[in-house]
Amino acid sequence: QVLEIELSISYDVDPSSLDKDKMPPIMDASVYDIVQKVVMTTKFKAMEGLALEIARRIMSNYTVAELVSVVIRRRQLFIPGDVQSAEVEITVDREDLGEK
């Protein structure tokens, strides 16, 4: 099945430390690698479980991340009626994961 995944990661940044030639600490392909690994190697009955696991892995791999939002959208539905897609959005912070 084809899933669309949107990911938002929030963290504090000192504007004076930003450099146009350097990427912020978590803006690289490793984020994609984490999401791909979770999607390809784990099975969940509900999209909520997948979204939560993606958020957990991002938070555990990037200590700078304070808040992670994951949206998962599935366009291919096998249910009757005029439904275009199913979507779930989960937002977690470190407190939600029992880290503070």
Give the ranges of each region predicted by the language model.
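N-terminal, polar/charged subdomain of small-to-medium soluble alpha/beta proteins
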Residues: 1-100
